[in-house]
Amino acid sequence: MKVFSAVLIILFVCSMIIGINAVRIPVSCKHSGQCLKPCKDAGMRFGKCMNGKCDCTPK
């Protein structure tokens, strides 16, 4: 059980670090599939739609 808790904490910290590096680009969207190409064109690796704008995560 202690190992499981430690793994959860590590995953939580890693997800926060990745989320901090997200960059919002001025592209409107309705779903995350619309953000893939604009984020790749901006030099980012991943993209998702949040509050109607694309949030991109760097490589």
Swiss-Prot record:
<dbReference type="InterPro" id="IPR036574">
    <property type="entry name" value="Scorpion_toxin-like_sf"/>
</dbReference>
<dbReference type="GO" id="GO:0008200">
    <property type="term" value="F:ion channel inhibitor activity"/>
</dbReference>
<keyword id="KW-0800">Toxin</keyword>
<keyword id="KW-0964">Secreted</keyword>
<feature type="disulfide bond">
    <location>
        <begin position="29"/>
        <end position="49"/>
    </location>
</feature>
<dbReference type="Pfam" id="PF00451">
    <property type="entry name" value="Toxin_2"/>
</dbReference>
<keyword id="KW-0632">Potassium channel impairing toxin</keyword>
<feature type="signal peptide">
    <location>
        <begin position="1"/>
        <end position="22"/>
    </location>
</feature>
<feature type="region of interest" description="Interaction with Ca(2+)-activated K(+) channels">
    <location>
        <begin position="47"/>
        <end position="54"/>
    </location>
</feature>
<keyword id="KW-0528">Neurotoxin</keyword>
<keyword id="KW-1221">Calcium-activated potassium channel impairing toxin</keyword>
<comment type="function">
    <text>Has also been shown to inhibit with high potency Kv1.3/KCNA3 and with low potency Kv1.1/KCNA1 and Kv1.2/KCNA2 voltage-gated potassium channels. Also binds and inhibits the molluscan calcium-activated potassium channels KCa (Kd=135 nM).</text>
</comment>
<protein>
    <recommendedName>
        <fullName>Potassium channel toxin alpha-KTx 3.5</fullName>
    </recommendedName>
</protein>
<dbReference type="GO" id="GO:0090729">
    <property type="term" value="F:toxin activity"/>
</dbReference>
<keyword id="KW-1015">Disulfide bond</keyword>
<keyword id="KW-0732">Signal</keyword>
<comment type="similarity">
    <text>Belongs to the short scorpion toxin superfamily. Potassium channel inhibitor family. Alpha-KTx 03 subfamily.</text>
</comment>
<dbReference type="GO" id="GO:0015459">
    <property type="term" value="F:potassium channel regulator activity"/>
</dbReference>
<feature type="disulfide bond">
    <location>
        <begin position="39"/>
        <end position="56"/>
    </location>
</feature>
<dbReference type="GO" id="GO:0005576">
    <property type="term" value="C:extracellular region"/>
</dbReference>
<feature type="disulfide bond">
    <location>
        <begin position="35"/>
        <end position="54"/>
    </location>
</feature>
<dbReference type="InterPro" id="IPR001947">
    <property type="entry name" value="Scorpion_toxinS_K_inh"/>
</dbReference>
<keyword id="KW-0872">Ion channel impairing toxin</keyword>
